[in-house]
Amino acid sequence: MCWLRAWGQILLPVFLSLFLIQLLISFSENGFIHSPRNNQKPRDGNEEECAVKKSCQLCTEDKKCVWCSEEKACKKYCFPYFGCRFSSIYWLNCKVDMFGIMMLLLIAVLITGFVWYCCAYHFYLQDLNRNRVYFYGRRETVPIHDRSATVYDE
């Protein structure tokens, strides 16, 4: 049963992260309902700067802009609302879309977590076996006493 619990600890974060990414994608495809508190805000000059750019290469040179391939338009970068589907947004390059970047980030986090989990498990087993010795005649593991501990008799 211990292996089942270990797999549960590994797979639960994976499924939760996939669920959150799917939730984010579904929100970006359906759009958000925006209700700004103050509609009289002065417009940011960055929106016009992004709208002027007409190609993906020009748009992705600026870190404040994203390229929407569906509309073939450059828009201001505003996470998580971009104004177009999550799988058709390009930021900082024209080869990998935002969905691909998020998947690569998720894979990197999962691999880092798995390596950390393996290291922690290795050190746990190493610490567990430090105070045990295997007797070949008995074919069993027997705990040994700590000889470095001092006992004071008065």
From Swiss-Prot:
Segments spanning the bilayer are 98-118
Provide one Gene Ontology cellular component: membrane
Q: Which residues lie on this side of the membrane: Extracellular?
A: 27-97
Q: Which PANTHER family match?
A: PITUITARY TUMOR-TRANSFORMING GENE 1 PROTEIN-INTERACTING PROTEIN, PROTEIN CBG20567
Q: Does the keyword Membrane apply?
A: yes
Q: Does the keyword Acetylation apply?
A: no
Name of the featured protein: PTTG1IP family member 2
Keywords, A to Z?
Membrane, Signal, Transmembrane, Transmembrane helix
Q: Which InterPro entries match?
A: PTTG1IP
Q: Which locations, inside or outside the cell, does it occupy?
A: Membrane
Cytoplasmic compartment residues = 119-154
Membrane topology per the entry is: Single-pass type I membrane protein
Query: Which stretch is the leader sequence?
Result: 1-26
Chief site of localization: membrane
